[in-house]
Amino acid sequence: MAETVLFQEKQRFRQLGLWTVVLAFAAIFWVGFVYQVLLSGTYGNNPVSDVELSVVFAVVGVYLPLFFYKMNLTTEVLPGMLQVYFSPFHLNPVRVPLRLVRTYEKVVYSPIGDYGGWGIRWGRKGKAYNMSGNEGVELLFYNKKPLLIGSQRAHELYQAIRQAKEMKSEIGS
């Protein structure tokens, strides 16, 4: 029997600054590859071989931007369970049984100040899964540090967690 999904959100990196840096860095290798390998020029004062440049171009010029493009954070709320999947880092979703959550609240936070940036982060306020923005839901557990789930739809996530906890307690009664 398939479980009811109360909330699902898939987020990608949207920060213009991040994409500017990634694409500018990749562009350097695109220029080098085109100039040296395709146009038979010499790129730089101490050029590497065409094969070496082709390998570095593939990694930095193609796979690095593709890696950031494919990276995503999927959050799902099911009855009694929160699942977080940060692709490509997680092979399986991180499952958080909501019965272990003492309390939770919708928060506005500073990604850089509180957690040191975006992604899977550990900061002075605990662990965070976030992709962009500064809103989310902070989960406080009975036996461990807080967990922040960043969301572009933090209010909906909060409501779904509340509903999932209520559904689980009704099912267990």
Model regions and ranges:
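Non-transmembrane, membrane-adjacent beta-strand/coil modules in membrane-associated proteins
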Residues: V84-K145
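Short aromatic/basic micro-patch
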Residues: E76, R95, L148-S151
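Transmembrane-cytosolic junction motif
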Residues: L64-G80, L91
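A short beta-strand motif that forms part of the nucleic acid-binding face
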Residues: M81, P88, R153
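A membrane-cytosol interface segment of integral membrane proteins
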Residues: E3, G123-S173
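Canonical hydrophobic alpha-helical transmembrane segment
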Residues: E52-F68
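N-terminal membrane-targeting/pre-transmembrane regions
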Residues: M1-S49, Y129, A154-E156, I171-S173
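ATP/adenylate-binding site constellation spanning eukaryotic-like Ser/Thr protein kinases
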Residues: P79, L98, A154
